[in-house]
Amino acid sequence: MRDFQNAFDAALAGVDSTIVEVMGISAQFTSGAQRGGEVHGVFDDPESLGFASSGI
């Protein structure tokens, strides 16, 4: 179990990337310093993902 203190931590680390891969969506930065960049993750409400018009 690599550097984990218990089996629960090891199990969570193993499934985390799978959850993001299967359930995740991509969001693109449309303004600010990271304009054009992309992040992939699991969002609570992906249909209303947005930020202030001035960017993030």
From Swiss-Prot:
GO terms for cellular component: viral capsid. It is found in: Virion. Keywords: Capsid protein, Virion. Gene3D superfamilies: Phage tail proteins. Disulfide bonds: none annotated. Its main location: virion. This is Tail attachment protein. It comes from the Viruses. It comes from Enterobacteria phage P21. Is needed for attachment of the tail to the head.
